[in-house]
């Protein structure tokens, strides 16, 4: 194993062993990253300190900002590999791909960028999986505002994400009247009312021929009833909707209300994120394609990253990193150590080229 791969393997394994789910104490991993940054001569700044903090470190002025999140989803059961176990060049463990691999690449790249005196900034958040409040706070930092490009180091197999679909998560509730199931005429069944509403939305739940370019809708949770012999007085479903940039959350809600009418239910927005779109012909995007070499392509993804929280400053925003998104949150999550090393090299070259072009 060469020196770069050894460095990657050491940092990634240490990050993986520092547990960072929503239930874990986040301080150990924040302290670990802060110490790494301080040893490079950087001075970490903290945002959202009363919650799950975001760390920003800056070297020089107006450099590319690299961003990643240190938190993970829970581990889960039935894994075939131990945490941070490496087999045939792949390291296994929760967070290896999503996205401590990307954070490792950022830290390794930072060491080289400091050595060659290229301006850059880093942002590490700790609540991407549970709300993105840290990213929202970090978006106000001066490094974010000055960056010519923001590059989120999430796993993309080194494709360049320039578009993300919007997210709208809703709670839909119907009410009825409770009664003994032997006398349904005395009650009003909330589940039956919900069934009628969902039938009006059924065609929206069918997967379109091109899911990336169209709205998709999933009914993912349902709650109703208390006992088999009691007419249910309430029924509630949670709905997840992803929509393309040509739509807005307002137009999606209007579409739903047109289908199901304006009464007979309660509708509540649980969470929403706007779609994000970056012009693939921007110089900052073309420069990244240059660095990645032949075969590099820009893509659209159906999910959201913290890129959505960073928009609004006029800088180019992209997602690009090592690892396969399909293994994120899965059992036996893993990432190639050599891929993380390649990502570090890509980030160094990209920051260097962007610095030369913006001087």
Q: What does each model-identified segment do?
A:
Residues 71-87, 146-147, 162-173, 318:
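Acidic-glycine-rich active-site phosphate/pyrophosphate-binding loop
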Residues 3, 45-48, 155, 162, ...:
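Metal-dependent amide/peptide-bond hydrolase catalytic core
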Residues 100-169, 209:
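Acidic/histidine-rich catalytic neighborhood of metal-dependent amide-processing enzymes
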Residues 87-89, 109-122, 146, 201-210, ...:
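Phosphate-handling active-site elements
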Residues 15, 19, 37, 154, ...:
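Residue-level signal for inorganic ion chemistry
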């Amino acid at each position: 194993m060469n020196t770069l791969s050894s460095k990657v393997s050491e940092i990634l394994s240490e990050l993986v062993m520092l547990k960072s789910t929503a239930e874990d104490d986040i301080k150990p991993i924040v302290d670990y990253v802060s110490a790494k940054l301080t040893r490079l001569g950087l001075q970490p700044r903290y945002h959202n300190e009363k919650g799950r903090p975001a760390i920003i470190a800056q070297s020089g002025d107006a450099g590319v900002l690299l961003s990643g999140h240190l938190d993970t989803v829970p581990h889960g059961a039935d894994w075939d590999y131990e945490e941070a176990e490496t087999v045939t060049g792949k390291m296994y463990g929760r967070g290896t791909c999503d996205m401590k691999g990307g954070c490792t690449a950022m830290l390794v790249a930072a060491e080289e960028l400091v050595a060659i005196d290229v301006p850059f900034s880093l942002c590490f958040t700790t609540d991407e999986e549970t709300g993105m409040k840290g990213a929202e706070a970090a978006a106000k930092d001066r490094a974010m505002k000055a960056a010519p490009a923001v590059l989120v180091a999430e796993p993309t197999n080194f494709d360049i994400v320039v578009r993300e679909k919007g997210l709208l998560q809703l709670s839909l509730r119907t009410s009825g009247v409770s009664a003994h199931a032997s006398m349904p005429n005395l009650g009003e069944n909330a589940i039956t009312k919900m069934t009628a509403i969902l039938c009006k939305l059924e065609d929206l739940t069918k997967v379109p021929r091109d899911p990336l370019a169209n709205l998709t809708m999933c009914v993912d949770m349902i709650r109703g009833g208390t006992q088999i012999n009691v007419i249910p007085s309430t029924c509630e479903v949670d709905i997840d909707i992803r929509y393309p940039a040509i739509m807005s959350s307002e137009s999606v809600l209007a579409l739903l209300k047109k289908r199901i009418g304006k009464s007979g239910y309660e509708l509540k927005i649980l969470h929403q994120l706007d779609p994000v779109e970056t012009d693939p012909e921007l110089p900052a995007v073309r420069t990244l394609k240059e660095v990645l070499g032949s075969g590099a392509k820009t893509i659209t993804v159906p999910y959201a990253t913290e890129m959505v929280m960073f928009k609004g400053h006029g800088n180019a925003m992209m997602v690009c990193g090592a690892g396969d998104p399909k293994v994120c949150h899965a059992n036996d999550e893993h990432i190639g150590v050599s891929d993380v090393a390649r990502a570090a090299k890509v980030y160094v070259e990209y920051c260097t080229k962007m610095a030369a072009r913006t001087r």
